Structures are given as structure tokens and as C-alpha cells.
């Protein structure tokens, strides 16, 4: 398992955006993408940084 810092920008229903940063403990980057649903249309952008 690795530790990742995940920062994502979500588009809200009113068109505004919201930035959220979380820490994830996952096997790899692909698991982070799947776990947080980062390929969903409401996600404007994201960054994943491995911190361990």
C-alpha cells in the first residue's frame, strides 16, 4: 500500500467549482482514480501525488 495526496476540483450543480484534498491509502494510482471516481464528468481536474 502507498499513501497518496489527492486534490480534485468538482463542478457543483450551480456551475461553481469546489476543491477538495484528501489522503488515500491504495495499491496504485489507478486504484485511487477508481476509488474517488475521478473519471466522472463532474470532476474538472485532479492531481495525485505519492507521498511515501
Describe the predicted segments one by one:
Residues 1-17:
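Short aromatic-glycine-(Arg/Gly/Cys) micro-motifs in beta-strand/loop hairpins
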Residues 9, 27, 49-52:
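A structural detector for beta-sheet-dominated domains
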Residues 28-37:
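Low-complexity, intrinsically disordered Gly/Pro/Thr-rich segments
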Residues 38-52:
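Short, mixed-charge low-complexity intrinsically disordered segments
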